[in-house]
């Protein structure tokens, strides 16, 4: 009975997968489409009203300069701006520019009528966001009014900001254009990332030493000693730091350690390097509505992977088509304009 049930379940799952699979005949790849842009930032503050105009200009630059966005075919292109801000992000002095996401929805036309509007294929990139373009930032808790001492609110938040401001950086591959750096997640993986920046400014990311990380870990854990577990973690941290040599403490920090589990870093160049965003990168003589850095997901599937994607989905991998049509040199040069005014 169990074997029969398992067989029936497998047949049902296979049928569902086949039913959900898409084929090219489901779409109208040659039907002309249209471009639209909308702003999802709802704040009525003056800086956001000004910023919305800057981002609209940027969106229009993409519309005018990327062929598949200028003359959509097989889909309507719905571009949307999404804001992203929170009080802890703004507390960090390395975060100056207002951050935003610009999303492109490829609303494919169905051969049976209508178009794909709910979670269609899409691509997005980030503007002025220091938490993108690299590995994920940590998520150490900030002050909790239900658990923490009110007198420690400022100290706890400052310690958490420092802890959460350190991130692992993917391997640098090359500079594809002045002001455009390419990183890859792994040597055998297609996900890549681009950072578009002003090369006349100081480095956007700066390394941290093992000692710096040891100090900010101590600052954080010494503020959290209410429970026995908190005290055990602090004691373990102090033990781990004592086991590090002076040479390793002064070395650049890399992610991972064979034995330590609180201060999980090493100075032996093993793993991804740890860095933080450089506060000096920002040109603070400009308003915080200016565009000073952008980060892009940059997929580069090989032909076999692209063919498999097309077979499984019935449509091209639009993200890769899009990034391969962007004029990266021109985009980097326009970075110096900051407001992307359209001439």
Where do the protein language model's features map onto the residues?
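Functionally constrained cores in energy, signaling, and assembly domains
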Residues: 11, 15, 158, 185, ...
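Surface-exposed amphipathic alpha-helical segments
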Residues: 303-343
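Bacterial Sec-dependent N-terminal signal peptides
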Residues: 1-22
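Intrinsically disordered, low-complexity regulatory segments enriched in Ser/Thr/Pro
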Residues: 121-134, 138-140, 284-313
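Short, solvent-exposed recognition patches
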Residues: 36-283
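Residue-level detector of beta-propeller blades
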Residues: 31, 35-37, 330
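Cleaved targeting-peptide boundary
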Residues: 22-31
């Amino acid at each position: 009975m169990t074997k029969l049930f398992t067989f029936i379940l497998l047949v049902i799952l296979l049928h569902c997968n086949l039913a959900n699979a898409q084929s090219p005949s489901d779409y109208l790849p040659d039907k002309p489409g249209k471009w639209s842009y909308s702003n999802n930032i709802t704040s009525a503050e003056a800086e956001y009203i000004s910023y919305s105009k800057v981002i609209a200009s940027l969106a229009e630059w993409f519309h005018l300069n990327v062929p598949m966005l200028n003359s959509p075919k097989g889909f309507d292109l719905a571009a949307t701006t999404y804001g992203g801000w929170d009080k802890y992000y703004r507390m960090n002095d390395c975060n100056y520019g207002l951050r935003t996401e610009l999303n492109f929805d490829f609303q494919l036309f169905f051969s049976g009528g209508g178009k794909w509007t709910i979670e269609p294929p899409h691509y997005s990139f980030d503007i002025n966001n220091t938490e993108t373009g690299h590995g994920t930032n940590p998520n150490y808790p900030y002050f909790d009014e239900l658990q923490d001492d009110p007198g420690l609110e400022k100290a706890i938040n400052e310690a958490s900001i420092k802890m959460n401001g350190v991130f692992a950086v993917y391997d640098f591959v090359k500079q594809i254009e002045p002001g455009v750096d390419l990183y890859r997640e792994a040597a055998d993986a297609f996900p890549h990332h681009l950072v578009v920046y002003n090369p006349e400014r100081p480095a956007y990311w700066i390394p941290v030493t093992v000692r710096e990380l040891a100090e900010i870990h101590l600052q954080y854990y010494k503020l959290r000693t209410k429970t026995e577990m908190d005290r055990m973690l602090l004691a373990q941290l102090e033990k781990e730091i004592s086991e590090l040599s002076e040479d390793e403490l002064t070395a650049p920090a890399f992610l991972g350690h064979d034995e330590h589990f609180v201060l999980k870093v090493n100075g032996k160049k093993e793993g991804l390097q740890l860095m933080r965003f450089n506060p000096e990168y920002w040109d603070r003589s400009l308003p915080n509505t200016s565009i000073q850095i952008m980060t892009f997901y940059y997929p580069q599937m090989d032909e076999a992977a692209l063919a498999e994607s097309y077979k499984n989905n019935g449509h091209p991998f639009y993200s890769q088509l899009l990034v391969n049509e962007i004029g990266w040199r021109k985009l980097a040069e326009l970075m110096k304009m900051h407001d992307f005014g359209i001439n």
